[in-house]
Design a protein with these regions (language model features):
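Bacterial Sec-exported substrate-binding components of ABC uptake systems
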Residues: 2-52, 89, 147-176, 226-228, ...
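Structured C-terminal subdomain patch of bacterial secreted/periplasmic proteins
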Residues: 40-41, 45, 132-146, 150-155, ...
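A short, structured surface patch at a secondary-structure boundary
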Residues: 41-97, 101-106, 203
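His/Asp/Glu-enriched short active-site or ligand-binding loop at hydrolase and phosphoryl-transfer sites
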Residues: 65, 71, 191-213, 234, ...
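Flexible loop/hinge segments that line or gate small-molecule binding clefts
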Residues: 73, 112-140, 264
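Short helix-initiation/N-cap motifs at beta->coil->alpha
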Residues: 82-92, 209-222
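Alpha-to-beta junction loops
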Residues: 98-102, 200, 228-232
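Extracytoplasmic ligand-binding site segments that recognize negatively charged/polar headgroups
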Residues: 127-139, 175-194
């Protein structure tokens, strides 16, 4: 009974921390006139959209989500916070800021965005699952903000634009996002797209995602032992540590463990894009494998 409780608790934690992945830019814009010349006022409900808007036009950003990623960022300190954690945004506060449009995450913010649309406020629903999505979103924001400042992802994400060494094609990797259940990303996830960007052979890239976490699939210890990845990418979520993976009964039988090819990754940047800084850190780690 106790083990069942731990399993369902793990599912709950994973649901909280993985789902935002899919809630972040294939853009669906409602009610916004892209031809206007006035300075736009934006409320961003995700940390990544806030960072992107701030990078293009910090004066346009009038509302942001409360996020640990902004704790030491001076430019965000005096901008009103409209949401915290997994709580739904404060609609009254958003309205009081009189934004021209509000950027939210597809799925998680659907209800909030619908209410704002009913009140005549334009919205953008985002769903970033690849680097291409990120580049497209920044380009679109530049047009929406009517700013002459060009997108400069390459300057902010220098580690993500490094020349790829062709020798990496001979390196296979396996990323483990969690232990119970044991989840690994395929090519339809943000982390899967980053792995592909660096030319690695992701052992689960082409395997179908059949569970509740789209872009991620369940694997077991038998599969892991049979496929023997050369490199293991282990993710530390806000609710776990890297030491949890050592509890696997097959841990010491894995060639990646024997050869000390274990690489730790933070949740933000690798699983949930989070911010430009966290994405760049994830890319830097991938470039060092």
């Amino acid at each position: 009974m106790k083990s069942n409780f731990k399993y369902f608790l793990s599912l709950f934690v994973i649901q909280i921390f993985i789902n935002p992945l899919y809630l972040l830019a294939n853009q669906q814009i409602k009610g916004f006139d892209t031809g206007q010349n006035k300075k736009s006022k934006v409320v961003a409900l995700t940390s990544l959209s806030a960072d992107l808007v701030g990078n293009l036009s910090i004066s346009s950003l009038v509302g942001i989500p409360g996020s640990s990623l902004f704790k030491n960022e001076k430019e965000f300190q005096n901008i009103p916070i409209v949401s915290r954690g997994r709580m739904q945004p404060d609609i009254e506060k958003i309205i009081s800021l009189k934004p021209d449009f509000v950027i939210g995450a597809k799925g998680f913010h659907d209800k909030t965005l619908r209410k704002l649309e009913d009140l005549g406020i334009s919205t953008i629903s985002t769903n970033i699952k690849s680097f291409k999505d990120l580049e497209s979103f920044e380009s679109q924001l530049q047009n929406l903000l009517s700013t002459k400042k060009k997108g400069n992802l390459e300057n902010n994400l220098k580690s993500c634009y490094l020349k790829i060494d062709s020798s990496r094609n001979n390196k296979n990797v396996l990323a483990l996002v969690s232990l119970k259940p044991m989840l690994s990303p395929n090519s339809e996830s943000w982390s899967g797209s980053l792995i592909k960007r660096f030319g690695f052979d992701n052992l689960t890239a082409d395997l179908p995602s059949k569970g509740e976490f789209k872009g991620y699939l369940n694997i077991n210890q038998e599969w892991l032992l049979k496929n023997q990845p050369n490199n293991l990418l282990l993710v530390k979520t806000p609710a776990s540590s890297l030491d949890q993976y050592k509890s696997l009964t097959i841990w010491n039988k894995l060639s990646a463990v024997k050869n000390k090819k274990i690489f730790g990754f933070e949740y933000y940047g690798f699983i949930n894009p989070g911010s430009l800084s966290s994405i760049n850190k994830a890319c830097k780690k991938l470039s060092n494998i």
